Curated annotation (Swiss-Prot):
Belongs to the class-II aminoacyl-tRNA synthetase family. GO terms for molecular function: arginine-tRNA ligase activity; ATP binding; glycine-tRNA ligase activity. One of its GO terms (cellular component) is cytosol. Signal peptide: none annotated. Keywords: Aminoacyl-tRNA synthetase, ATP-binding, Cytoplasm, Ligase, Nucleotide-binding, Protein biosynthesis. GO terms for biological process: arginyl-tRNA aminoacylation; glycyl-tRNA aminoacylation. The keyword Zinc does not apply. Tetramer of two alpha and two beta subunits. The keyword Aminoacyl-tRNA synthetase applies. It is found in: Cytoplasm. Its EC number is 6.1.1.14. This is Glycine--tRNA ligase beta subunit.
């Protein structure tokens, strides 16, 4: 059959920019999927999706004008029902055949197949393959129905009385197979043709008559002044942004923001990047405020210098390319000034009140109807932060003479004071004008206002950092004060929400509990904090009084699940992760070394046998119940059990010393020498001896082995 390339375009009014790329991919993807299902494509068909503010389109290679005919086998009825005793068709069979367009003459051609219960009659025929126009009609209907958009518009067609529903009103439909229009294809009250429209203002030809499916993109670019491909348009904008920054000079660069680049790509069809500027006086306002208002409200790209500081220049992606762009530049500069002036006004007004003076206002801000106000929340965070700071200082002071002294007490008092001040003030920027206008700046503005109030740097940094990490890969708080307050804030959220039953379900996680749990894990691990997980959770629960149930065990499971997922994402195998997590390690800071030790152990020749033996030991001890690890040497009778005991006495102290020093890899490698005596023990010794004393002694020996082998991880999880 004659393969030709297919082009389908739906020309519409301006589509929602944040959804455009997803809409384009979905529209094209469903078209291809439906055509494939109907046998209208080849094995080598390729899809290209197009999406611009006013069009969704798909180009599919090697599309057939009609699908191949195919044999169809239809089950009729059991032979006993369809044929009488003399082999003649029954009325039931004749009626069924008539419905299929056949008669008694076709009875000899019926196929008999045994389906496991009885012999059944099948009618075989050739079904005509679907014509492309019919197949595309079905595919187009499906693609329109399945567009991933939560809200659609209802609008009237040109006849004045028919209403249709779509994301935006549609005004044109192109359907070309090669250069031929697929006559009869319709969608949303439109009939397919070969004409579309280019840029509203800059098209050199209107309408654009598409000559063939393959000329679509080039004709739109040359005649319609439109870059139809989302990816090509995005790349062109990125190129122009960098070129404009290079023209400005001084090492400036446009802000790196993929979401903004995607949104701007969805707003223009012919991008033209222009350099604009604002008054330098506005740079006295925190740059986060200026950057956010330019990005969020105006879709501008701020320019940063080599040190990441905001400059007074910014880039605009225009949808028109006039010979003299001065009017466009001046218009954008005029529009941005009031936005920046508002930000400056908010900043100046907010600094007229100190953060401390705003604390009482938090009592009027509802946090959650079951957990009270932000004011109550602040008191809980203070309670938890104090407990964490005390635990942290105590752990750091162990073996540190400088901290375990009068100077250490002064340092502890300073830490506790800074932590308490930061926890008290961390949420106060929620009642400032700036954060009221830009909620994304919470924490950040608190840090600026703390500096303005003359608070210590540690407190200001902690207020700014206490929401960190906000997302995967985000920076962690800079100093211990910030880490403590950030931990307290996240634990307050986790313990509180779990305590009232607000758990994540499926894709729903409105309080970002998964992100909070990962934040706790990252801080404990990456900051190498000597803090125990259960102790942290235990310190948080009392802060809530009788408002919540104690769900610490359930929350710990949740955190370990997040930790396991994080480790798997880092490339560790499920067995390696299970081996470490099975012990529910309290010091999460030690987990990276533990799992690396397990990985190294798993490469040893002795590992499979020891893992299998460990699994066997685990099962034996589980059945035995409570087992005393004490071994009476006088009751050791068999050479194999004596050898195992001697090996344990010789190598376990060394392995334990290595474990206690934190060298987990060396500890496991030291224990690898136990393979031979362990194998011999299971070959030659009856653990469940009839004599009770012997049985208990041998169980005790295995308990001793089990305790030695499983300090780093549950090695039985490595057994295949």
């Amino acid at each position: 059959m004659n393969h030709q390339n297919l082009l389908v375009e739906l020309f519409v009014e301006e589509l929602p920019p944040k959804a455009l790329q997803k809409l384009g991919d979905a529209f094209a993807g469903v078209l291809l999927e439906q055509l494939q299902a109907q046998g209208l494509t080849s094995a080598h068909s390729q899809l290209t999706a197009f999406a611009s503010p006013r069009r969704l389109a798909a180009h599919i290679t090697e599309v057939l004008p009609a699908a191949a005919d195919k044999a169809v086998s239809q089950k009729l009825m059991p032979v006993a029902v369809g044929l009488d005793a003399s082999g003649q068709p029954t009325p039931a069979l004749l009626k069924k055949l008539a419905a299929l367009g056949a008669d008694a003459a076709s009875v000899p051609q019926l196929k008999r197949v045994h389906d496991g219960k009885a012999e059944v009659l099948f009618f075989e025929s050739m079904a005509k393959g679907a014509l492309l126009a019919d197949g595309l009609q079905k595919a187009l209907d499906e693609a329109i129905a399945k567009l991933p958009i939560p809200k659609v518009m209802r609008y009237q067609l040109q006849d004045g009385w028919t209403s249709v529903h779509f994301v935006r009103p549609a005004h044109g439909l192109v359907a070309l197979h090669g250069s031929e229009v697929l006559v009869g294809v319709q969608a949303l009250g439109l009939t397919a043709g070969n004409t579309t429209h280019g840029h509203r203002f800059e098209a050199s030809v209107d309408p654009v008559v598409i000559q063939s499916a393959d000329s679509y993109a080039e004709q739109l670019r040359s005649e319609g002044a439109v870059i139809a491909s989302f990816a090509e348009r995005r790349a062109e904008i990125a190129r122009q942004l960098q070129a404009a920054a290079d023209r400005v000079g001084g090492g400036v660069r446009p802000i790196d923001d993929d979401a903004l680049l995607d949104e701007v790509t969805a707003l223009v069809e012919r991008p033209n990047v222009l350099v604009c500027e604002f008054e330098k006086d506005f740079l006295a306002v925190p740059q986060e405020c200026l950057i956010l208002t330019m990005k969020a409200n105006q879709k501008y790209f701020p320019l940063l210098d080599a040190e990441g500081k905001l400059t007074h220049q910014f880039l605009v992606v225009s949808n028109i390319s006039p010979q003299d762009a001065s009017a466009v530049i001046q218009g954008n500069e005029r529009v941005v000034r009031p936005r920046l002036a508002d930000a400056k006004f908010f900043f100046d007004q907010d600094r007229k009140k100190t953060l401390v003076s705003r604390v009482d206002q938090l009592a009027k801000v509802v946090y959650h109807n079951k957990l009270g106000t932000q004011g109550e929340r602040v008191e809980r965070v203070r309670h938890i932060a104090k407990a964490i700071a005390t635990q942290l200082f105590t752990a750091l002071a162990q073996g540190n003479a400088a901290l375990d002294s009068q100077e250490g007490e002064i340092a502890q008092d300073y830490l506790l004071t800074c932590v308490d001040n930061a926890a008290l003030l961390a949420k106060t920027d929620l009642v400032t004008d700036m954060v009221g206008e830009f909620p994304e700046l919470q924490g950040i503005m608190g840090g600026y206002y703390a500096v303005s109030d003359g608070l210590p740097d540690e407190v200001a940094h902690a207020i700014e950092d206490h929401y960190k990490p906000r997302f995967a890969g985000d920076a962690l708080p800079r100093e211990n004060v910030g880490v403590v307050v950030a931990l307290a804030d996240k634990l307050e959220t986790l313990v509180g929400m779990f305590g009232i039953g607000n758990l994540p379900t499926g894709d729903r996680d409105p309080f970002a509990l998964r992100r909070h749990a990962l934040g706790v894990i990252r801080m404990l691990v990456e900051k190498e904090l000597p803090l125990d997980l259960d102790a942290l959770l235990a310190s948080a629960v009392p802060a809530f009084g009788d408002k919540i149930e104690d769900t610490s065990a359930q929350l710990a499971d949740f955190i370990y699940d997040r930790l396991a997922g994080s480790l798997r994402e880092q490339g560790y195998s499920a067995q390696e992760v299970d081996a470490v997590i099975a012990l529910r390690p309290q010091r999460l800071a030690l987990v990276p070394r533990q799992i690396e030790a397990v990985r190294a152990f798993a490469t040893l020749e002795q590992a499979p046998a020891l893992a299998a033996a460990n699994k066997r030991v685990t099962n034996i001890l589980k059945k035995a119940g409570e087992v005393d690890p004490h071994v009476n040497e006088e009751l050791l009778q068999e050479p194999a059990e004596k050898d195992l005991y001697a090996a344990l006495q010789r190598f376990v102290p060394e392995a334990n010393a290595q474990f206690d020093s934190g060298d987990y890899t060396a500890s496991l490698q030291t224990l690898a020498v136990l393979r031979a005596p362990v194998d011999a023990f299971f070959d030659d010794v009856m653990v469940n001896a009839e004599e009770l004393a012997l049985r208990l002694n041998r169980q005790g020996l295995l308990k001793k082995l089990h305790m030695a082998m499983n300090r780093v991880a549950d090695l039985s999880r490595l057994a295949v």
